[in-house]
């Protein structure tokens, strides 16, 4: 029987598989390392995984993979049909497993501080079917700690302060170090503290890290700052432990343990007697080694002959004692003062009072220097009174001043005219007597405040000032008058006895007992039939009607003179006029219409007169307007004055060329005399090499030729002209042609014999052109013969 190719291949595969299983059963499984491993128990009723924790040391530095442990399943008979796989944290990257034996190795260096344990999953599979023969099981590989981290001070370097003079054991600051090693395993993380630098001044608690003072009475003024070095060591400080250090800067803070002291036992200062009050005479300062509030001073004068003359106060910024003047100094009265000054701390510390008194005293002597002082008045203000009726030259009062210096120089007086501009007063230069220089009026100025100057005769620059207040006493020199300009109305239907106005009076005088006015009608009006007056005895009076039946048509205005007398001595009086207008009133007595003529008649003009004046003014304005209009329309005469000679006038033509529109219609032939031939300008400074011929006339020549020839002539003139600018410039030319039949009158060639123009028509233009006709007429030959 022959086998096909397919059957032959299957047969060979079966033989190869049989040989492989036979070899595996005969071969021995590789023995594991001597390190213990954990596997499932042989006796079980149900297949399962049971694992303990695996441990591996951190920081393994060997060249070979580190053996961790062994996985084993009770299904594995050692025949090679079971393979092990590993999954989870670090599988394949950190941890590898021998799929035949289940041995686990670590291929990388592990650090417990980075990761303390790894969670993995184990799986046993059938090698042929790749199916699990055991349920997946989870286990942990824990990293075993070694002492590979030194203690670290996370908050360093430290700064702290402690009061000076503190007792031993005063807490300064606490330092703390941390160790990243496992605190639950061994002594790798157990730290103790010690001081490497800073002894014998400070100490540190080994377990807590609290720094304390180790010496008493440390003085800030001797040394105010200390640098400490603190060490933290693990393994409880044993040999082989790791350590770390930090620095601590300790500053001694100030306490008030130093009293103030004056550098000198006495001081001397000089000051002129002219110093004003509150001026600074001297500054003294007591030294204090303390700082801040502990160095703040208080100064006071405890003794001496200048207690009321001087005072001392502290300067908060500099802690100096400032001595100032309270009263004016006088060299002639006292030449020197002695002061006993005490300086003390503002806040004393009771703990240090035993060190001595916290105050000190010194002596200050102040020498007063003599200066040339201005004269001094005996009084700062001289009040005086004078009646306004006083005659010129009357003595008002006297001022007195003296020279305070020892020389006692004579004094001369004068009035500061800036305070007496109207020169109402005079003063005697030697005696100081003040007199009136003008008549006084209390109503104009009731009080005069003047300044009197006193100067030394020997030194006029020394001037003293005295102040005089002169009150003007009142006399009754002003008559009473109406309090206002009264004007009232009376109704046509007013009844007798009706009050139509209440009046009052004023008086510029000011009597000592007050004003009292008396009102009455003048003698000639006392018995008038229209109005009456009632004095109210309170400086007012009432005006009443005496009758009824007032009519505007009969009389529209009444004038009532009123006599007013004051109570002065002697009394004065005046007559004031009250204007009463008659008005048409309603039933309630309210005026409706008053005669308008009453407002015009006092001015002396009637309504008709005002209308006539207004009409005249308007007529005058119209005439002025017509004259101005006619003058503006007036034209200049076309014919000159016959007596004026035409040759005495110069006519200027300043017309400039037109714009683009005018230029387009420009006729060159009409703008110049084509019969005139101009000579070419030649240079006068050199001999010409070419003689220019006379130019032909441009009559009957096309315009473009005229333009070309004209520009060519101007170009030649510019080339030979020595005064032409040496650079290109814009040249402007204007033609004054022969637009008139008479051609150009300004051309000198027009009177030559070559001209064939007939000027006989000039004789027909009148006497103004007579002279011109003689020059250009038929008789011109005789004119030039």
Swiss-Prot record:
The keyword Cell membrane applies. Residues 28-47 form a propeptide. The keyword Metal-binding applies. The chain crosses the membrane at residues 608-628. Residues 28-607 are extracellular. InterPro entries: Cadherin (IPR039808), Cadherin-like_dom (IPR002126), Cadherin-like_sf (IPR015919), Cadherin_CS (IPR020894), Cadherin_Y-type_LIR (IPR000233), Catenin-bd_sf (IPR027397). One of its GO terms (biological process) is calcium-dependent cell-cell adhesion via plasma membrane cell adhesion molecules. Residues 1-27 form the signal peptide. Glycans are attached at residues 449, 530. It comes from the Eukaryota. GO terms for molecular function: beta-catenin binding; cadherin binding; calcium ion binding. One of its GO terms (cellular component) is catenin complex. Keywords: Calcium, Cell adhesion, Cell membrane, Cleavage on pair of basic residues, Glycoprotein, Membrane, Metal-binding, Repeat, Signal, Transmembrane, Transmembrane helix. Residues 629-785 are cytoplasmic. It is a single-pass type I membrane protein. Pfam families: CADH_Y-type_LIR, Cadherin. It is found in: Cell membrane. Residues 49-153, 154-262, 263-377, 378-482, 482-599 form the Cadherin domain. Three calcium ions are usually bound at the interface of each cadherin domain and rigidify the connections, imparting a strong curvature to the full-length ectodomain. Cadherins are calcium-dependent cell adhesion proteins. They preferentially interact with themselves in a homophilic manner in connecting cells; cadherins may thus contribute to the sorting of heterogeneous cell types. This is Cadherin-7. It comes from Rattus norvegicus (Rat).
């Amino acid at each position: 029987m022959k086998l096909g190719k397919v059957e032959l291949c299957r047969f060979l595969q079966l033989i190869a598989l049989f040989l492989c299983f036979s070899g595996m059963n005969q071969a021995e499984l590789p023995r594991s390392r001597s390190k213990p491993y954990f596997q499932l128990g042989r006796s079980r009723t149900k297949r399962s995984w049971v694992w303990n924790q695996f441990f591996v040391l951190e920081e393994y530095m060997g060249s070979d993979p580190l053996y961790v442990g062994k996985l084993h399943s009770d299904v594995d008979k050692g025949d090679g049909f079971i393979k092990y796989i590993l999954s989870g944290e670090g599988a394949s990257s950190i941890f590898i497993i021998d799929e035949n034996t289940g041995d686990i190795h670590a291929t990388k260096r592990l650090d417990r501080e980075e990761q303390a344990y790894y969670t993995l999953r184990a799986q046993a599979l059938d090698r042929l079917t790749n199916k699990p023969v055991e349920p997946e099981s989870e286990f942990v590989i824990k990293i075993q700690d070694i002492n590979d981290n030194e203690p670290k001070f996370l908050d360093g370097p430290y700064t702290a302060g402690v009061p000076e003079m503190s007792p031993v054991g005063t807490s300064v600051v606490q330092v703390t170090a941390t160790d990243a090693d496992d605190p639950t395993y061994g002594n790798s993380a157990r730290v103790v503290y010690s001081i490497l630098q800073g002894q014998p001044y400070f100490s540190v608690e080994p377990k807590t890290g609290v720094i304390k003072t180790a010496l008493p009475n440390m003085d800030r003024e001797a040394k105010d700052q200390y640098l400490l070095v603190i060490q933290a060591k693990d393994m409880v400080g044993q040999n082989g432990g790791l350590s770390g250090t930090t620095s601590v800067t300790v500053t001694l803070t100030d306490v008030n343990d130093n009293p103030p002291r004056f550098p000198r036992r006495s001081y001397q200062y000089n000051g002129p007697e002219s110093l004003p009050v509150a001026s600074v005479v001297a500054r003294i300062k007591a030294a204090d080694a303390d700082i801040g509030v502990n160095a703040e001073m208080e100064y006071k004068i405890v003794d001496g002959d200048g207690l009321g003359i001087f005072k001392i106060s502290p300067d908060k910024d500099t802690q100096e004692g400032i001595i100032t003047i309270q009263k004016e100094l006088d060299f002639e009265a006292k030449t020197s003062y002695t002061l006993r000054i005490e300086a003390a701390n503002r806040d004393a510390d009771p703990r240090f009072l035993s060190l001595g008194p916290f105050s000190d005293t010194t002596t200050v002597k102040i020498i007063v220097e003599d200066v040339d002082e201005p004269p001094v008045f005996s009084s700062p203000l001289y009040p005086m009174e004078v009646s306004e009726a006083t005659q010129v030259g009357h003595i008002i009062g006297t001022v007195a001043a003296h020279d305070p210096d020892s020389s006692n120089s004579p004094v001369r007086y004068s009035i500061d005219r800036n305070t007496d501009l109207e020169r109402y007063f005079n003063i005697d230069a030697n005696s100081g007597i003040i007199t009136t220089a003008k008549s006084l009026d209390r109503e104009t100025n009731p009080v005069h405040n003047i300044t009197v100057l006193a100067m030394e005769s020997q030194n006029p620059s020394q001037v003293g000032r005295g102040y005089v207040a002169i009150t003007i006493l009142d006399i009754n020199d002003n008559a009473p008058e109406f309090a206002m300009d009264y004007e009232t109305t009376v109704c046509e239907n007013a009844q007798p006895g009706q009050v139509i106005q209440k009046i009052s009076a004023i008086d510029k005088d000011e009597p000592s007992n007050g004003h009292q006015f008396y009102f009455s009608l003048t003698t000639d009006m006392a018995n008038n039939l229209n109005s009456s007056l009632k004095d109210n005895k309170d400086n007012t009076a009432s005006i009443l009607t005496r009758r009824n039946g007032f009519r505007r048509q009969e009389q529209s205005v009444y004038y009532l003179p009123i006599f007013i007398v004051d109570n002065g001595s002697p009394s004065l009086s005046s007559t004031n006029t009250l204007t009463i207008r008659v008005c048409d009133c309603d039933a309630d007595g309210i005026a409706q219409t008053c005669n308008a003529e009453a407002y015009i008649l006092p001015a002396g003009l009637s309504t008709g007169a005002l209308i006539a004046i207004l009409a005249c003014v308007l007529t005058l304005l119209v005439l002025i307007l017509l004259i101005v209009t006619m003058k503006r329309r007036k034209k200049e005469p076309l014919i000159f004055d016959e007596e004026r000679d035409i040759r005495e006038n110069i006519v200027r033509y300043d017309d400039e060329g037109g714009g683009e529109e005018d230029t387009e219609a420009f006729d060159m032939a009409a703008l110049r005399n084509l019969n005139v031939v101009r000579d070419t300008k030649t240079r006068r400074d050199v001999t010409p090499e070419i003689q220019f011929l006379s130019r032909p006339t441009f009559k009957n020549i096309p315009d473009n030729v005229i333009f070309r020839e004209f520009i060519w002539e101007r170009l030649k003139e510019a080339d030979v002209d020595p005064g032409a600018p040496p650079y290109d410039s814009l040249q402007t030319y204007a033609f004054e042609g022969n637009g008139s039949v008479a051609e150009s009158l300004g051309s000198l060639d027009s009177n030559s014999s070559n001209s064939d123009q007939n000027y006989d028509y000039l004789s027909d233009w009148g006497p103004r052109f007579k002279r011109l006709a003689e020059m250009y007429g038929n008789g011109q030959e005789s004119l030039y013969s």
